[in-house]
A protein has these predicted regions:
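Conserved Rossmann-fold NAD(P)-dependent oxidoreductase catalytic core, especially the SDR/UDP-sugar
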Residues: 8, 13, 32-34, 75-124, ...
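NAD(P)-binding Rossmann-fold cofactor-contacting core
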Residues: 28-38
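NAD(P)H-binding glycine-rich loop region in Rossmannoid oxidoreductase-like domains
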Residues: 37, 42-93, 97-100
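Structural motif
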Residues: 4, 57-58, 105
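N-terminal Rossmann NAD(P)H-binding glycine-rich loop of SDR-like oxidoreductase domains
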Residues: 2-24
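Oxidoreductase cofactor-interface core, primarily capturing Rossmann-like NAD(P)-dependent enzymes
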Residues: 10, 24-26, 116-183
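Rossmann-fold NAD(P)-dependent oxidoreductase module
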Residues: 17, 21, 97, 132
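Hydrophobic/aromatic beta-strand patches that form the interior of the parallel beta-sheet core
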Residues: 29-31, 43-45, 60, 107, ...
């Protein structure tokens, strides 16, 4: 029997990769703001109109507001509300809708070093989101905490990100022990 999956944020780097990795015999519904072409057939729900979710075996939440590199360290005031609206409010709204639809299992993308009491706004919001997801009472909660996301994107990445990625690829070869998780 095939499984049913919901993927929120299916147009980003992780969401697109995830959708294309799910076996073709499985039923996938993507929740996104715009349609894109996948290597497999998908059902489409518009994120802005999504109030009630269809039942599924598992929900993947891969949402994230697009930030500039500098915003990860010290987020500009003009970005904070937009970031929180997506990375906390929208993530929680979708998770709550999933709970109402009797979805028992959820996986969500967070960030390495996320913590609700972090002094870094980005990490603090991610940590608060993780806690709220756990509080919703799903039977299974998977929280993935990647470091910097590398991969082919639809949009051209900026020069500062290219330089950062170049140096982190080199530095990654020298990270070991406790620092290995930052590769």
């Amino acid at each position: 029997m095939s499984k049913k999956y919901l993927v929120a944020g299916a147009t980003g780097l992780i969401g697109t990769t995830l959708v294309n990795q799910i076996p073709l015999n499985e039923d996938v519904t993507v929740i996104a703001r715009r349609k894109i072409n996948y290597k497999r057939p998908v059902n489409f729900l518009n994120l802005d109109e999504c109030i009630k979710l269809p039942h599924a075996d598992h929900l993947f939440i891969c949402l994230g507001y697009p930030l500039e590199l500098r915003d990860l360290l010290l987020m500009r005031k003009s970005i904070k509300a937009k970031f929180k609206a997506v990375d906390y409010n929208l993530v929680i709204k979708i998770a709550e809708a999933a709970k109402q639809s009797s979805i028992k299992s959820v996986s969500v993308i967070s960030s390495i070093e996320a913590h609700p009491k972090s002094l870094n706004y980005y990490l603090k919001v991610k940590g608060q989101m993780e806690n709220k997801i756990r509080e919703l009472g799903f039977e299974s909660v998977n929280i993935f905490r990647p470091s910097h996301l590398l991969g082919e994107r639809e949009k051209e990445i900026t020069l500062d990100v290219k330089i950062f990625e170049f140096f982190t690829n080199i530095a990654g070869n020298f990270l070991f022990g406790w620092f290995k998780k930052y590769k």
